Amino acid sequence: MVTPTTIRTVDLRSDTVTKPTESMRSAMANAEVDDDVLGNDPTALRLEKEVAEIAGKEAAMFVPSGTMGNLISVLVHCDERGSEVILGDDSHIHIYENGGVSSLGGVHPRTVKNEEDGTMEIGAIEAAVRSPKGDLHHPVTKLICLENTQANCGGRCLPIEYIDKVGELAKKHGLKLHIDGARIFNASVALGVPVKRIVQAADSVSICLSKGIGAPVGSVIVGSKKFITKARWLRKTLGGGMRQIGVLCAAALVALHENVAKLEDDHKKARVLAEGLNRIERLRVNVAAVETNIIYVDIPEDPKFGAEEACKSLEDVGVLVIPQATFRIRIVLHHQISDVDVEYVLSCFEKIFHS
């Protein structure tokens, strides 16, 4: 095992920290570009066409971030202020997107408990639906949102059968289904199922190009042609219309072509790291829950040495991780982490938690 006598930097804060590869930089430098607001950037059009085909949807649109992609999607489906969206209480849209659906869109979030596996209980979702024929004191439900993989639950993959059932429930009540698929490629690789099958029941999907596959910037949202037409208006309204975005889309195309195949290796390294951490006497990892590239490490409940202090000690030896809770640390693997890095991280954790 590598010992932490020689400090190296291993950045496990997120899979968004990756640096553009040489092939990405070359593609960016040589990208064919035009004005995307006018709808003429050929590289953007190529990326959008390819992602739409991968997801099995009619059309797609590049957006600067996943937060904007989710916000636009919710606002297209909930086109009347005061509409309601049902989503997980531990979902990214609910916790990490500044409440944009309510503050900017006037959409009311109605949360349902996320189970440990990332799902929401079907009966609980149905019980949360509020009809336009119901009590006039309540907002009207228009949309259900799922997240796949579910990050706060540890990068868990939602089963296809479950997504299909939620889709059936949405149709039964005249609702739309949006999937925050920031790490949908991780789910696809882990489940061994094409993306288009996973999102078959969804009316729209937001797919991150940075998380998982390591492009430097952006997300793509997919849906029907009608959905994307409305989404373009909202993107412009929110300031997300950009000009020669082919420079960014070129890197994303490289990520799609080169890095999806690396995700399986990311998942294997995550499993090795999780098992190694779980063997350290004072640490606990639910290894069975490590399905993709995210690990949560529970540390001893020492009021003088919580996750904040542990992360600082790890940073001092070059290991960059994030406190998830008072006594929990989050680790995210990506394609620029090597086997040697994994060994080094294990040795650093062992040294810190045995000292």
UniProtKB/Swiss-Prot annotation:
Identify the enzyme class. lyase
- N6-(pyridoxal phosphate)lysine PTM positions read K211
Q: Could you confirm whether the keyword tRNA-binding appears in this record?
A: no
Q: Which reaction does it catalyse?
A: L-threonine = acetaldehyde + glycine; L-allo-threonine = acetaldehyde + glycine
Q: What is this protein's function per UniProt?
A: Threonine aldolase involved in threonine degradation to glycine. May play a role in the removal of L-allo-threonine.
Tell me which family the UniProt entry assigns to this protein.
Belongs to the threonine aldolase family.
**Protein name, as recorded:** Probable low-specificity L-threonine aldolase 2
Q: What is the lineage of its organism?
A: Eukaryota, Viridiplantae, Streptophyta, Embryophyta, Tracheophyta
